[in-house]
Amino acid sequence: MILLRVHMKFAEIWTTRQSSTSFRVTTTVTDTVSVTITEGESVLEIANTLEKNGALGDRDEFLSLCNSEKFDSDFDFIKAETNADKRYYKLEGYLYPDTYEFYRNENAESVIYKFLNNYETKINEKQTVDGYSKKTTVLKMVEESDTKYSLDQVMTIASIIQAEAADKEDMYYISSILHNRLTADSSLGVSSLGLDSTKFYPYRSLEDVPENDRSTYKSRYDTYDRKGLPYGPICNPGMDAIIAALNPNSSDYYFFCHDSKGQAYYASTLEQQNANLEYIESYDN
């Protein structure tokens, strides 16, 4: 008699059966799928990715759980969130981008636990970071940061960096600009963060907003209207963006823009920003 391993696929079972005169299954045989969640995907986009790959049993349940208090008691970083009633998805920012193994049509709650457990592991994991004399963790960097932003605020900044930056180097300059704008006085002509990436959240763009709502849609996270940070993260950032949020470059920049190839242009004044935009428009058509 042969006992089969849990989660053996059909081909393995058939091979095992052929080499034995008898066998019995001791656990439910379940096929699995490998799914990669890329940095910057939002809760809505992750739901689509999981569903497309056959890893999610109930998309609507997944989205509902992502805005519930179900996980507060198990994860302090979720329980510590503020503005919960104003967020579109409480778990936005904490579904860590990575490659995961899921059962086909896996229970939504089980899927979310895998994301949150991984995030908890990552923020407690020691790693080498430029500027630190010894290995450190995300939580330690938050604790020691001069800005005194909470972990949730850091994740919100990181999510914006992830959404706006063209590459890793750009992340540290955009981090600097965000930190500068958050502490700027009115004499600099900076009244808000004014970021396109927040304008239509939880959607990526106006085209992603349901057609019936497009003409009147207004996001609560729109940083053109709202001062300071949005109510929470706008996507799920990777570790590079999180570290950049905690370690901004030192600069006097308050503005940035990119051309169609991702080349970044930074500016200290609105006049310089407008000149950069005019320059890009002159050749980037």
Placement of each model-derived feature along the sequence:
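Bacterial extracytoplasmic/cell-wall-associated proteins, especially those involved in peptidoglycan
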Residues: 55-56, 71-285
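Signal peptide-directed extracytoplasmic domains
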Residues: 1-122
